[in-house]
Amino acid sequence: MDCARKGWLPTCLAAVVAGTILAATISHAHALSIGDKRAYHAAFAAAQKNNWKAAARDAALAHDPLPREALHWLAITRGADGASFGEITRFIVNHPDWPRQPALEQAAEEAMNGVPDNVLAAWFTKHSPITVAGKLREADLWSAQGRGVEAHALIRAVWINSDLSAFDERSIFQRYHDVLRVDDHEKRLDRLLWNDQVAAARRLLPMVPAGPRAVAEARLGLMTFAGNTDSLVGQVPATYHDDPGLLYDRVRWRRRKDMDDGALDLLVVAPSDPTHAAQWANERQIMARRALAMGRPDVAFRIAERHDTTSGPSFAELEFLAGWIALRFLSQPEVAYAHFVRLYDAGTLPITIARGAYWAGRAADKMGYRDLAASWFDTAAERFTTYYGQLASSAQGVTPIRFVGEPQPSMTEINAFDRQELVRLTRDLAAAGADDIVTPFFRRLCDEATTPDQYMLMARLAREIERPDLEVEAAKRASYAGVNLIAEGYPIPELPKGGGVETPLLLAMTRQESAFAHEAVSRAGARGLMQLMPHTASIIAKALHLRFSQKRLTTDRRYNVTLGRAYINDLLTNFSGSYVLAIAAYNAGPARVKDWMSLYGDPRTASVNVIDWVESIPYAETRNYVQRVLENLQIYRLRLSKAGFTFTLASDLKR
């Protein structure tokens, strides 16, 4: 077979692997041969450049078939042309535990043209369609089977809930206009507006009556800061003045214009809207903090408390805000306690659980219930790798931390782990230099881990393939299940020597910035281990009399850390040694930190409560960053200490 022929894509790979079955007894000792490593290294490098002919040619030279199947998987999930519906569906059936199943199913649906109805109907009974085309094809099948009511309901749901191009909108409307109702157009328009899809919403305006159209035009004006916004809002009929979407966009418009008093006036009277609780929650979080900064804690509390969220990060943040404001600004510990208990009860992750428990302890202590407070502090301190657990550990009377030994998998468990197909494939991909492709397979394995030993084996696998970022990720996953893998979760790579910044702090920041992935590049352009922006790095390099090289930020670990160490040292100097301020400045920039000091005071002074100052940071990313770095710092000091160790977070906050 000529795998390099014109038009070859995943079809060739499927042919090569057809009929090959991986023996379940292959052990860890069975590694890729030198020749296979060379062949697959070239194949995956070619695939990364979308040169599928070269990828097939190189892969055909290898003897071990499993990485070739991964190459086939990559071609399908990348949307490479050529794979038939039958090929893709067979791959899905044969690899049900492989990652990115939705992408595989999407590829199958995109290849369904010409597939017989009976074949598709059989497939859809086990795999509900996920694409617009797939759902509409299923609706047509239902219509042909006499299931018109169900078919029409599905068509309407697709119209209302799908993000469509202008071409697809016209096509669907022309084909199903007799099924779609005015009410469906109104629901679609409302969804598009809530999702800020301006262009799509404008296209739908002619399809809705005058009242909803006036509301939509006003909302679009508010979203886009149109010059005639007041006029558009004024043209909304009185019967639509209480439209939740219109009120939401008016609040958001005022907030974006820094018209905070006006935004607060609307927000405090906003009606309950559980359907769009997530959007409202964002405004409530922002405006509650602004109200607090304006010296209006009573308003801030009302805004935070009256949310419609029932779970998730927004629920946790608003319950915390309501409790914190009640405790620290309104002197209402009983009210605060109820919110903190709700936060604790809803928590599923160590940080949230520790946060709820610590602050419930603070509220109980304020109420005079010392034993209850101590119990809550004990509960928080059990999550000793978290910021709030470490704060709780310094509370008077808290039970000393007891470290539990790390899991030690037996040889039986190790051998069973090594026999797993995805474990072997992860090793093979790493050996072939396919690091980007390793990640989804590793994460899929993590999804299946349920025991301490399995989490430990995943962390060891990451270390074996020299992926400290995945080792940290495995340890974090373990912590969510109550398993602490300290050595694995807090790697200690060799760092360049230098003064000014303690090694535990440097490690703590690097763990948070990149999880030790030296080639990491953020969406904003920050690069390398310490996620340095090129402009900042160039200034530091000049000050150190080093030649600046953007490439070296992601290829030379020592170079990146040398510059990062110098930068954090400068920040510490500029902020008189304050860890809180320097860490915040590393994330958000010194100028913003100085702005926050003007708003919330100087946390280095005795008159400012530094714990409250950290909670007051208006940027969630920076607030989280400061807390995560400080908690990492304690664990790295623990790892590097040669004598007895006690958490010093409370004093680190004040330094």
What are these regions (language model features)?
Residues 30-33, 56-66, 77-80, 89-99, ...:
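Solenoid-like repeat scaffolds
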Residues 65, 73-74, 89-90, 94, ...:
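Catalytic glycan-binding domains that act on GlcNAc-containing polysaccharides
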Residues 46, 79, 112, 142, ...:
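Residue at a conserved register position within TPR or TPR-like alpha-solenoid repeats
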Residues 49, 78, 82, 115, ...:
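Structural motif corresponding to the intra-repeat A-B loop/turn of tetratricopeptide repeats
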